[in-house]
Structure formats: C-alpha cells, structure tokens
Regions:
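Short, solvent-exposed mixed-charge patches
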Residues: 1, 141-142
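Secondary-structure boundary elements
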Residues: 1-67
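Hydrophobic/aromatic-rich core segments of domains that either
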Residues: 74-141
Length: 142
C-alpha cells in the first residue's frame, strides 16, 4: 500500500512546536502560496543549518534548529517538521546512505538542504545519496 504524505509529527519531528510556528509566521509564510512558503522554509534550512557528518539521527528537529547543525537525517527532520507545521504534507525520501524531503503541494518537490548548491525541488547527488532510486516514507526512525 502506498502511504500518502502527512502533516503528522514523529518522535524526532516535533510538528507544531511553538518555536516552529513562530518562526514560520514571522519569516516564511506567504499567505495563499504554499510553494513560496515551502521554498522560504527550504532556503532557511539549506542556508542556516550547517552539515555535520555522522550516521543516523542524533538530535531531531528541535535540537538541530537550536544547534544550527546536523547530518542529512537531522536536517530532514527539521525541514519536515517546519513544512508539516506550515500545513504542507511532506515525505522523507531515502536513497543510498542519504535522506532528504519531498513536500507535496501541486506536485512533489525534492528538497535536499545538505548542500548550498542545491535548489528547491531539484536536488543533486551528494554524500552517496542516489536521487534517481529512492523510497518515500512518513517517518525516519533511526
């Protein structure tokens, strides 16, 4: 069975946290334009959260925001938490040794914030990730 994208939280994806709500309302929300809102959120995570090289989840969304650094798993948790808090159904995507996000608005936008050269909706291959062969998930539990 195919999972539909969700706006629900998970253990490491603290959807609805007041800090996330305030950040979105103050800085990212474009009324009536979910694509622009998603793009603003993506650029924030891509540009403001430093990449750290380690395996699996160590922090989750909130701690990644606090520390302003995280690996692909923790950056995905933060981006998913912010997007879902903004009301945007979002998947986690998993390729070979790499995680990124896929917000679903009018279409699927693949968003990998781990490299400042990546663009909203158009990630490129990095850190061993394969964006051509991947699976979609509603949670990332490792």
């Amino acid at each position: 069975m195919i999972e539909l994208p969700t706006t629900n939280g998970t253990q490491f994806c603290e959807v609805g946290h007041q800090v996330f709500k305030d950040l979105i309302d103050r800085n990212f929300k474009v009324n009536g334009d979910l694509v622009a809102t998603a793009r603003n959120i993506y650029h924030f995570v891509r540009d403001e959260i430093k990449y750290e090289d380690y395996s699996n989840t160590h922090k989750g969304a909130f701690k990644t925001l606090q520390e302003k650094k995280g690996n692909c798993c923790d950056q995905a948790h933060l981006l998913v938490a912010l997007l879902r808090t903004a009301g945007i159904p979002t998947y986690y995507a998993h390729g070979t040794n790499h995680w990124w996000t896929v917000p679903c608005i009018d279409k699927q936008y693949h968003c990998d914030p781990t490299n400042r050269n990546h663009q909203f909706g158009n990630p490129s291959n990095n850190h061993g990730g394969n964006h051509n062969r991947f699976s979609l998930h509603n949670s990332l539990n490792h």
